[in-house]
A protein has these predicted regions:
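A short, Lys/Arg-enriched amphipathic alpha-helix followed by its capping loop at the start of a domain
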Residues: 3-11, 27-40, 202, 210
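Acidic, Mg2+-coordinating phosphoryl-transfer loop and its flanking beta/alpha structural elements
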Residues: 46, 196, 211-251
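Phosphate- and divalent-cation-binding pockets in alpha/beta enzyme and binding domains
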Residues: 27, 52-55, 131, 165, ...
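Asp-based phosphoryl-transfer active-site loop
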Residues: 5-22, 225
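Active-site phosphate-binding/coordination module
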Residues: 25-123
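Short, structured coil segments at secondary-structure junctions
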Residues: 59-62, 69-70, 173, 227-229, ...
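Hydrophobic "anchor" residues on beta-strands that sit immediately upstream
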Residues: 8, 65, 213
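Conserved acidic, metal-coordinating active-site core of Asp-based
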Residues: 109, 113-213, 219-220, 227
Length: 252
């Protein structure tokens, strides 16, 4: 019998480990504890910011690398990877592997799109923490963390015409937009799948070849699910799946 390859799990947060409306993780607590006890790496892969993810890593007792802002960057704890990470920049207690465009580039693009199209785009940079909290149901402190963005700007977009115009102008500027659970996100072309591949390469170097599992709930997670060995699409509370996902085309 062959030796089983080490397991690495990648998971989205909102709607997957966290309940979509309340952001509670207690239904996942037993599984999270099991991963800690068995020392199975859990790599959080989310649209959330580094500051937001750090809160949940502490709650989960998680010490593994993590992916932020829809693949905008990978953060690797220096404590566990004490040698330089290829492509990484030392930032505090992490090696940061930047994969997306810097936030100031995105904000300049938003301003240009407004100028060229007349769209009344509003992003997190335009909102106070109180307004973000009202839109998302986050606490005020969590809303402040959500505004600490580095690689991705969530935008409030109304209607298909605005969405199409935004996407077209983003492409002209060398950027992309993707639809999340609540907002449209402007970013520099990075995605969760590309970030997952970078993390897998690190684990392959450390552990030899690994088996990867990806868990997500939305179309935004498809790049991650396509990059792993075992993809898992989570149902919504009503038992349905994200209607933007073609189940027949899901990777097997």
């Amino acid at each position: 019998m062959g030796i089983e390859k080490p397991l690495v799990i990648f998971s989205d947060l909102d709607g997957t480990l966290l309940e979509f409306e309340t952001y509670s993780w207690h239904e996942a607590a037993e599984a999270l504890g099991l991963l800690v006890r068995r020392r199975i790496p859990l790599v959080l892969c989310t649209s959330k910011t580094r500051s937001e993810v750090e809160e949940f890593r502490a709650a989960f007792r998680n010490c593994d690398p993590f992916i932020v802002e829809n693949g905008g960057a990978v953060y690797v704890p220096v404590r566990d990877w004490n040698r330089a990470v290829p492509g990484g920049v030392r930032i505090g207690e992490y090696w940061q592997i930047p994969l997306g465009k810097p936030y100031d580039v995105l904000l300049s693009a938003v301003a240009e799109i407004r100028k060229q199209t007349g769209l009344g785009l509003r992003g997190f940079a335009d909102l106070e923490a109180r307004q973000v909290a009202e839109l998302t149901g986050l606490s005020l402190e969590r809303a402040r963390r959500a505004k600490e963005r580095e690689f991705d700007e969530p935008l409030i977009v109304h209607g298909n015409e605005e969405q199409d115009l935004l996407a077209a102008w983003a492409r002209k500027l060398g950027l992309r937009v993707s639809r999340g659970g609540r907002f449209w996100h402007l970013h520099g072309g990075a995605d969760k799948g590309r970030a997952v591949k970078r993390v897998v390469s690190l684990y392959d170097q450390e552990l030899g070849s690994v088996t990867t599992v990806g868990i997500g709930d939305s179309a935004n997670d498809l790049p991650m699910l396509e990059a792993v060995d075992v993809p898992v699409l989570v149902q919504k509370p009503d038992g349905t799946y994200d209607d933007r996902v073609d189940l027949d085309c899901m990777p097997e």
